[in-house]
Structure formats: C-alpha cells, structure tokens
Amino acid sequence: MELRHLRYFKVLAETLNFTRAAELLHIAQPPLSRQISQLEDQLGTLLVVRERPLRLTEAGRFFYEQSCTVLQLQNISDNTRRIGQGQRQWLGIGFAPSTLYKVLPELIRELRQDSELELGLNEMTTLQQVEALKSGRIDIAFGRIRIDDPAIHQQVLCEDPLVAVLPKDHPLASSPLTLAQLAGEAFILYPANPRPSYADHVLALFAHHGMSIHVSQWANELQTAIGLVAVGVGVTLVPASVQQQHRTDIEYVSLLDSGAVSPIILSRRKGDVSPIVQRCLTLIAQQAE
C-alpha cells in the first residue's frame, strides 16, 4: 500500500463519483478504478459499493477516517522537513477569541495567500500567549490584557469600544447606557481562569468609576457568557466588534462612558527582528492606513 492509494481513496470518498475524483486527481477514470480495486485487494475487503449512487461500505468509512489521519501526519512530516531546509516558513499566532472579529482576520487572509508559509493558529489567553512566546511555540499574539514582562514587547493596535449585552426583553435594552446604570445588575464575567484576564479589565473599569459589581456567574468563553445572558442569568460587557455575531435573543447596547474600551494588543518577543514577524508588522500597519 502506498500513500497515493490513500490520496486516491480520500478524494473518491469525498466526491463519491469516479469521474469527478479522476478530474480532481488529474488522472483518467480507468486507472483510478484500478487503483481503488488494488487497494481493496490488499485490504481484503470492499471499500466502495459500486452502485448508483456510489457509497462507502462500513469498512470504507472507517478507512477514510484513518487514511485522513495518516495523510495529515505525512503532510506534517513533509512540511517539517521543508521548513527545516528553508523551503517553507512557519508562523505561530496566538489569539484571544474576541480578537478574531477585528484586525486579525484580514492579517490571516493576507498571510494565507503565501503558499510557502505554514500558519499555526492557537486560541489562548494573554497569559498563555506570554509563555508560548517565551518558549518559541508562537511568534506573535493578539490579546486584550497589558502584561509587564521584560521579555515581551506589546503594542496597542486599536481601542475597541465596549458594549453591554442584555437579554432581549431587559428594561434597559432600548437605549445607550452608563456604567452606573449597569452596576446594579448581576454580571457574567469571562474568562474565569487564568487570571489576570479580560474579566479583571471589566472589574477595573467599574472600580475606576468608584463602583463594584456583583458577579453572579463565571464563564470560560465569550460565547458561553453571551449564551448565559440570553437565558437571563445576567448581563456582560463585550468588545463592540463582537456584534458581528448576530443573535435574536440578546441586545447589544452602546455605553456612554468614554473610557469604556478594550484594547487589541499585539505581543511579540522583545528584539525579534525575524523577517516573518517584520512582515506581519508591515501588513498590520498597512491595514491601519
């Protein structure tokens, strides 16, 4: 059995059409059919029921899942070798989930156009980003918390206004609010751990205005917090860019307080002048123009 057998079968399993699979593989249909038959002979079982419509056998479904894993490992092996030989580049990016709505998406789109660049995208909190940068697991990171670490350089890319998230039928959901109006509400904060986190940014915002809030529920993820708001557990604050996630069971309400913002912060290793990191900085600067 050779890797080409796995690649041929994978495409056939995904198209369930010999003609279409042959076109995608840039081979004629008869050779493809022979290759699949050879594979079945080697395995001692049928993988495909050759009827209309074409369908996979139970063994075929299992073999498809396993062959995808093998091909993925082969791809990892090939790319690792090419990166080591300087034929490809690798860029590790860490990001807090809420930064996916602003700045980061356009950067990823630009970088993905480079066929010789392998991207590693890692969802992580700001604290996790710092450790990953120090260990070399990632090269740049996007978060929302300022960290004082001599090994890390941070750059504020923009200030994202905060908005309140309220249940659809909440009496305060009809017009812009002040923090003082929200202070008496039960709050859902996220993430619960590790700290400090975006949650501490929200707590500090109220403390700066001489107020404290009652946290009725902690959540680990932004979307979990919004879901809990929808069912009436409490209210929360999110960056305004999150409003791109439309829901019919909540209301996003603007805040009138001028300081109610959350920064998007780019973090990288201090002194890192690698070409790929400099390229990212250039692309980000171009976005801001």
Swiss-Prot record:
Recorded superkingdom: Bacteria
Gene Ontology cellular component annotations, sorted alphabetically: cytoplasm; protein-DNA complex
Domain (HTH lysR-type) ranges: 1-57
Keywords of this entry: Activator, Aromatic hydrocarbons catabolism, Cytoplasm, DNA-binding, Transcription, Transcription regulation
Molecular function terms, GO-annotated: DNA binding; DNA-binding transcription factor activity
Compartment(s) where it occurs, according to its Swiss-Prot or TrEMBL record: Cytoplasm
InterPro entries linked: LysR_subst-bd, Tscrpt_reg_HTH_LysR, WH-like_DNA-bd_sf, WH_DNA-bd_sf
Single GO BP term: catabolic process
Pfam families tied to this protein: HTH_1, LysR_substrate
Start-end of DNA-binding region: 18-37
Family per similarity comment: Belongs to the LysR transcriptional regulatory family.
Role description: Positive regulator of the catBC operon that degrades catechol to acetyl-CoA. CatR binds in trans to the catR-catBC promoter-control region in the presence or absence of inducer but only activates the catBC operon in the presence of the inducer, cis-cis-muconate.
Protein's name according to its UniProt entry: HTH-type transcriptional regulator CatR
Taxonomic source organism: Pseudomonas putida (Arthrobacter siderocapsulatus)
